[in-house]
Every structure is written in structure tokens, then in C-alpha cells.
Amino acid sequence: MAEEFLNQISAKCSVIIIGAGQAGLSIAHSLQKKGIKPLILEKNYVGFSWKEQRWDSFCLVTPNWQCTLPDYQYSGKDPNGFMDKENIVKYLKKYSEFVKADILEGIEVKHLVKKNEKFFISTNRGNFEADQVVIATGAYHVPNRHPHSERLPTNILQIDAREYKNANSLPDGPVLVVGSGQSGCQIAEDLFFEKREVHLSVGSAPRSPRRYRGRDVVDWLDRMGYYSMPIGEHDDPKSVRNKTNHYLTGRDNGREIDLRRRAIEGMNLHGRLEELTINDIQFSNDLSKNLDGADSVYCRIRNSIDEWISKNGIDAPKETKYTPFWEPNEDVKGTKLECKNLSVVIWCTGYKSDFRWVDIPVFDGTGIPVHERGVTQSLGLYFIGLPWLYTWGSGRFCGVKDDANYLADIISLRTNKSAATKEMMECKALLGS
């Protein structure tokens, strides 16, 4: 049915959703429950980013029981496990079949503008008009790289995290992974387990326990209300949206990542990447500081769980205090890596948003959407699926349903109000004739 829209030069819709990921599908389902049938425009296909922009051994870092899309709770045999990318794609596709929304795949939105209270969308396959628009394209669009990355010799392959698949897909030789967030640490481990020579540039990313005092840490944090805490109640609401996620893994049925252990086993750790030339790469002498900082967050999480257990009188097994068991021997000037000893550099330094196609003044000076729980100052324009849209869970499988239901209420109210206004105007016209 959705393909019928392409037969029109300018298709008109009540609500258009841009993006058919978990956020777009969730808001579509919530709207349909209120009698509103939206149209979803998807640049690629359902599940694309999970299938094509994740490495082969990728797994969720949160347990499967947290996959709670609207009216579609995970129902598999391993609620405490961690879905691999193949099963994540299956989960999303099955949810798409459950939602039964009108989805146009292969539609890339080029321009969105608002005129006379209507939204006009230009795409690679035609134009669309809508009364209300929901942008569900996420926040991670353009990879970050060091500004001097082009200085590296051309014989060194440079790729971003979303381009990495497995160790065998890379040329032989040593690999430098830049960035120690979730992607960087997990990719470095993936290569290390395949006996590759791995160099990891460690930044200030925090790390998290995997299991503690008898439960997965996600279970404890969920019980403590962290995933449902509104951003306004956070200690640092201004910067929390930009903070790096804690590193740990869902691989091997879930475990911690302790870079000190990997160093003992032979992984080469360096401080933050400082400078690049055609001959060598210079790292800062902050490796000890960065490892200590990650451990400090790790211990704070454990301590907060201890306090909550004590406060609520919960019977849980005790665990010993964490003690670092490896320290780097750093030179005052940091370490240096010669380019001739490298074959690949993988940039795991995050992504930035790119909403330049949205020609509506709803952004701050850095291109980030300004909104109140997804509602912008432009009447009828919304965002969903952004990190910390409202809670920590907003950008995850566990919290998007609450945002979807919230926005569906607002969209429905405005749809009904618009319909009532139109009906009143038609009645007045008839009475006046």
C-alpha cells in the first residue's frame, strides 16, 4: 500500500515519520493505536544499520529482557542473554511485521522545510507533504576522525567503526584502534582474540561492571531507576547527552572489559592520540590517568549498588574490592608509534549529528536539536530516538516506548484539533452560503 504514494508527484499525509529503526517503528505503532496511520520514509531498509554497520561478533551490551518496544517485549528463550546482530535484525523485522505500518524503503530525504503550517519533504523519489513530521534518524550520522588523519601514509588503511567486519577483512599487519568507548574496546578485543597485533589508544571513556553481587549490573541499575530517570533530574543534564558510554560487552554471554588484563596478555595500550605525521603517531602520557578514571567510575557504580542494597535490606552475596593489577610504565612524553609498523587504523572516536537537510530553525549553534522530550518549537515537528531525549533509556530498546507513547498523545491531540477546526470552518462556509 505504501508504494501507492510514489505514484503521486506530491503525496499528502497527516503524519510522516523519517526513519524506520526501532524509534520510527515505535512511534508508528503508538500512533496507529490512536487511529492515526503514518507513512514512514526509510533511506535503506528495516534493520540496515544493525546489519551493515556493525561488526560480525557484535552483541547488545544490555540483556535481552530490556528489549521492550511498544507491545513487543522480548519473548525468546534467553532473556538474560545478549542478542547478536543477526538476531537484533530479526527482532526488528518481526516488530516491523507486527506494526504493519506503511513503509517506503530506499527513500532518502534531501530537504525538509515548513511553509504555511505544512511540512514539505523532498526525496530522491518524489515529494511529500505532511501536517506533522517525526524525525527518527538517530543522532550518529557522521564519523569523527582526528583532524590530521589525512597525514597518515596512503598505504595505511583507515576505516571507521561502522566499516569494520572482522579480522580477516583487514590487511595483514598491526592494527591501531583509536578510541576506548564501547566500540573501540570491543573491536580491539575482537582483533586481539584473532591473534592480531593490536594497539589501542585509550581515552577518558568510563567502564562498567558486568555482574555484581549476584545480578547483572543493568538489572541493578534498572531497579534503582537509572534508566527511567528524567534528564532534568540528572546531576549534569547539560553534558550527559554527549558523554561516552561505559565500556563492557555482551560477548561470551556478557563480561567486563578490563584493559589492564588485556595489557598483561599482550595488547599494546597507549594514551590519547595527540599528533599525526607521515612518519609516526604521538600519544599523550595520560594512559595511567585514563585507566584510573575508568576504574573510578567502575568502583562508583559498585558502591552505589552497595548503598542501594544496604538501604533496601536486600540479601545479596558480598564481593571483594577491585584492585588494579597492572600499571603502565609511561615516559613523560608519552609513547610514539612509527607508521611503517602499521597496516590499519580503525577510528572509534564517535559520531556527530548531521541534520543539515532540516531547513527549520529548531537547532542550537552546534546543529543539535532543541526540544522538550522530542517536541520542538516548530509546531508539528518532533524528534524521537535521540540519546537522553528524556531518559537514559530513550535511545535504547528499553525506553523508546515511553517517548513514543508520549509523542503519540501530543500528535493525536493536534490531529484531532486540526480536524475539528477544519470541520468548523466547513460548517461556517455552508451556513454562510
What are the residue ranges of the model-derived segments?
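Flavin (primarily FAD) cofactor-binding/catalytic cores of flavoenzymes
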Residues: 2-20, 25-52, 81-433
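Redox-cofactor-proximal catalytic regions of oxidoreductases
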Residues: 45-71, 262
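A short acidic, helix-capping loop that chelates divalent metal ions and anchors anionic groups
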Residues: 75-80
